[in-house]
């Protein structure tokens, strides 16, 4: 949960790396993240996103551990309004977007994370 909180609050890799393997990988079938391949890149991407949406926050809906597969999943809803600089000019529009993180562990560190997210829906709501 500490990694999730640090990542979702835009703490960047500096705030997330203690919970991850140094070479932790990342994947998502979402256009804004197509070139993001490491968890470090993703944590830094989230840091940038939070600069564009300073009111961004999440609401956890489910958090589950599958000990047999060394996997933790988190389902949440991200809400935010595009009022900050960086990326497209601020639109003042908001999104409320469902997503899931599937985090695979090696011991007590995340070795891989997959994000399941309908980015097209969120981008449309934001006017991007």
Segments (PLM) and residue ranges:
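C-terminal and inter-domain tail/linker signature
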Residues: 1-128
